[in-house]
Amino acid sequence: MSEQLLSELSPVAATSPSPAPAAQQKLNLLDMNRQQLREFFSSMGEKPFRADQVMKWIYHYCCDDFDQMTDINKHLRARLKALAEIRAPEVAEEQRSADGTIKWAIKVGDQQVETVYIPEDDRATLCVSSQVGCALQCTFCSTAQQGFNRNLRVSEIIGQVWRAAKIIGAAKVTGQRPITNVVMMGMGEPLLNLTNVVPAMEIMLDDFGFGLSKRRVTLSTSGVVPALEKLGDMIDVALAISLHAPNDTIRDEIVPINRKYNIETFLSAVRCYLDKSNANKGRVTVEYVMLDHINDGTEHAHQLAACLKYTPCKINLIPWNPFPGAPYGRSSNSRVDRFAKVLMGYEFTTIVRKTRGDDIDAACGQLAGEVIDRTKRTLRKRMNGESIEVKAV
């Protein structure tokens, strides 16, 4: 990571908004949380409760047509159609994994981001992107290799949830579980887009929005400390941290933002967030990708235990998911098991995460959103004699 880029990772940069829409465009109601929607209706001379009615139609019923909102009078519907729209990003491509995971390439302007639906026995998690690309340049992550383009707008973030809910809702007959959890773990660093991420999460939590529990909405960060310090005063959601190293020497190399905000500075900010939060039950989720002979030795496990001694947490060990041109290998099962046993010996709750969707490059660290990656993936599949279901939408 360049010094210039590091200098830009400041509270100002972390909260800078994405470009506003052109003046002639209708207002997209997906860009507004409930308070903003009420202010919009008040500006029209309408009662604030109209905002609640419309919001319920949008998010409870995935409705994007004002004419279908039958408890809104025709005159108001006509005014809404003249002034506003409900426009979620469209799906460009859908891929389905053998394990039930679905990855959507979502069109945002002339670019794409990726959204992943992960069904399990007792839940269904949606992994949502916050930026086109990523500025943090983590060396083990496919998204980082395409660089950073722009922040997503509120409508482009919550629109991923809306679009997925609409698709899954229409497919109930196939037995797919409705979305129960949302994780801000897709493309981008959420804390570098607070201006848009926070209102989107507010809609996820709002009873007139998706009505999710604050413990079921998780924000993951690599350590933009000034923005993390602000987050605790803005919203209370579950927190996960992308640590990935037991010491600053290794983390400086694989997570370059560590050169600006080192591990102790990061963990100190995490503890402050936990002190303010009810959503985390007093502990943070630590994400740790296992890189063969880089950070996966038993000596690293002992160092990690010492590093986290004063930070209440549970630890997710993540098998590294390969992408073309990456300089790493995935840790063997035996090395992961030995690593986990050391941590459990220190009485850390330790989970070895099951890889989901890696056959469609939807697993952790594999999201890229670019056609060039799909070309390389297809070649790799053919060389292995495998097939993949791809559907253009």
From Swiss-Prot:
Residues 120-358 form the Radical SAM core domain. Residues 1-22 are annotated as: Disordered. InterPro entries: Aldolase_TIM, Methyltransferase_A, RlmN_N, RNA_MTrfase_RlmN, rRNA_lsu_MTrfase_RlmN/Cfr, rSAM. It holds the Pfam family Radical_SAM. It catalyses: adenosine(2503) in 23S rRNA + 2 reduced [2Fe-2S]-[ferredoxin] + 2 S-adenosyl-L-methionine = 2-methyladenosine(2503) in 23S rRNA + 5'-deoxyadenosine + L-methionine + 2 oxidized [2Fe-2S]-[ferredoxin] + S-adenosyl-L-homocysteine; adenosine(37) in tRNA + 2 reduced [2Fe-2S]-[ferredoxin] + 2 S-adenosyl-L-methionine = 2-methyladenosine(37) in tRNA + 5'-deoxyadenosine + L-methionine + 2 oxidized [2Fe-2S]-[ferredoxin] + S-adenosyl-L-homocysteine. One of its GO terms (molecular function) is tRNA (adenine(37)-C2)-methyltransferase activity. Keywords: 4Fe-4S, Cytoplasm, Disulfide bond, Iron, Iron-sulfur, Metal-binding, Methyltransferase, rRNA processing, S-adenosyl-L-methionine, Transferase, tRNA processing. GO terms for cellular component: cytoplasm. Disulfide bonds join 127-364. The keyword Metal-binding applies. Its cofactor is [4Fe-4S] cluster. Residues 10-22 have a biased composition (Low complexity). S-adenosyl-L-methionine binds at residues 188-189, 220, 242-244, 321. Binds 1 [4Fe-4S] cluster. The cluster is coordinated with 3 cysteines and an exchangeable S-adenosyl-L-methionine. [4Fe-4S] cluster binds at residues 134, 138, 141. It is an enzyme of class 2 (transferase). One of its GO terms (biological process) is rRNA base methylation. The active site is at 114 (proton acceptor), 364 (s-methylcysteine intermediate). Its EC number is 2.1.1.192. Reaction proceeds by a ping-pong mechanism involving intermediate methylation of a conserved cysteine residue. HAMAP family: RNA_methyltr_RlmN. Belongs to the radical SAM superfamily. RlmN family. Specifically methylates position 2 of adenine 2503 in 23S rRNA and position 2 of adenine 37 in tRNAs. m2A2503 modification seems to play a crucial role in the proofreading step occurring at the peptidyl transferase center and thus would serve to optimize ribosomal fidelity. This is Dual-specificity RNA methyltransferase RlmN. It comes from Sodalis glossinidius (strain morsitans). The gene is rlmN.
